[in-house]
């Protein structure tokens, strides 16, 4: 339980996936005290993944309401006080948060689920009309409206958001160029075989991919908005829509002002507690000690947000444990789905399984230990990989390289050999 003998009021700053899930999990576990969920956005708490996928494509049947995690009546029914406003200050001594409008909320335990913000592009013209980032529902609505009339889009950054938007833009009939500073797409998150697949996928769809290129300036005027992107080598790319997708920066300002340590995010231990035992940090903003990997991590995924929220809810209702959930991620681009199980924290060998160039998995090993699996259009491999990694089922590169090897078959053989159900 929290520091007080009786259940104390909980204030959650941030109403994204992590913040919402914390409030919901607390009520599911019977937490009786007051719960205040503070949102800096006007919208009800909503799902973010569809923003760069189905929602962005402008499908008529996909409404804003379909993004909602719960309708407004849920918060009333569960006695969750949903407050709109921006928190300006945390007073850890008085255990109070103060909003920009001057209102304040006392807490027995504070949960910081403040997320992250898009990294800006520091070049001339970055504030021209028609230059977008994609993080919030408002961002997505603006992009969707621009995409309806845009003819030429330039995407700066070939990460998940950039490529998902590029796919949606091409499917909308827009000409698309992706500019990436590194030598391949998704360079920080996937192996070369997987990156090469997505290069082929986007080029087959008609997208121009430019690697090893920086942006020098964005051109346009107040009347027309953005009209071109100037590359570092002097080339000019015509554009009436530009998406900046070069990553995000965790929101750490509130924590730093409150005297909490910051280390690549709001620093927390394996139980997601900050240096103040009355303050937790979770989700995209939290740099945490992961029991599986040892080092401090900051992960950006729905799975991580939900797992963090549930752990905090458990701790506040009497069960304290370290966070050790296996990370997993996914991305949909055109008709292709990439799923990643585990985390590549340094591998020294790879094994590719699958003969189809459009459906394969890459197994990442460090020594004799499987660390992560990337699966392209092979959902059964992804599920088997998660079970293998979660349960620590042994697998060597030699075994994985056998001609008839499958992840599902290996899992079944190990299950039979141990007599333990691994389903």
Segments (PLM) and residue ranges:
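Mid-to-C-terminal Rossmann-like scaffold of FAD/NAD(P)H-dependent oxidoreductases
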Residues: 1-9, 15, 28, 285-383
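Beta1-alpha1 glycine-rich phosphate/pyrophosphate-binding loop at the start
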Residues: 2-80, 168-190, 384
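C-terminal catalytic lobe of FAD-dependent flavoproteins
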Residues: 7-9, 224, 233-261, 334-417
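FAD-binding core/adjacent interface of flavoenzyme oxidoreductases
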Residues: 1-13, 70-154, 230-232, 236, ...
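Rossmann-like NAD(P)H-binding beta-loop-alpha module
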Residues: 142-190, 194
